[in-house]
Every structure is written in C-alpha cells, then in structure tokens.
Amino acid sequence: MLAASQALAAGIDLSKPYGDKYGCINRNGQQVAADKMLLLTDKELITAASACTFDDKQVQADGSLVVTAKCEAEGEEGHAPAKFTIKRSAKNAKKLVVADEGGNVMGEVARCK
C-alpha cells in the first residue's frame, strides 16, 4: 500500500478540483451555462453533457491514472460504464489532460483557484 501512496504523491493529486474555465466557475453548482465544461475532482468527472462517478483509480507506471466510472448522460436514463486516463500535460506540468477510453482528448484542466 505504501508504494501506491508514494506513486500518488509523485503523480496526480486530485484532492483539490481541476477544471477548465467553466468547470472551475461551476465547481460549486451551476453558475453559468456552458457548452464546453470540464471539472475533475477526486470522485467525479463532470462535463457539459455528462456526470461520471469514479468506481476505481489505478496509478500506472508512468504516473498517469486510469479511472473506471459510471456516467450519466444528460437526457438519458441510467448509468453507462466508462474509462478515462488522466495524465500530466506535456506542454504544462501544472495541467492535466483527460482522455476517454479511445484516447480522444476531452480537454486540459488546471487546478481551480
């Protein structure tokens, strides 16, 4: 267990929320309507169209996180399973990149101020 917590300490810390501009504005509830929004916390990933609750987080050898989640899409019933990869941005080490299971980048997020 110690190795996992050390990897997490050196890797990605989600104890504070990360988001794009609108994700951070809306982190405490819907403040502004936005077509594009990304908010990442230690428990969920929220976009303009869906909300995903994390079931499991696995730290990878490269320091990235692979997250399995249940997602609820706007206007749809029930939850769908999903997998995301969260890793540090190659351009800016303070930012994180969120990609879906297919490797499509959903967006880049920075720690909310």
Could you tell me what each predicted segment is?
Residues 3-11:
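Sec/Tat signal peptide C-region and signal peptidase I cleavage site
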Residues 12-14, 19-47, 78-79:
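Short, solvent-exposed loop/hinge segments that bridge or flank secondary-structure elements
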Residues 21-22, 70-73, 99-104:
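Short, flexible beta-strand-to-coil junctions
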Residues 23-27, 51-53, 70-72, 111-113:
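Sequence contexts marking disulfide-bonded cysteines in secreted/extracellular proteins
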Residues 3, 17-18, 46, 65, ...:
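Processing junctions and N-termini across compartments
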Residues 47-91:
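Contiguous, well-ordered beta-strand patches that form the walls/edges
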Residues 85-109:
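Short, exposed beta-strand-loop hairpins at the edges of beta-sheets
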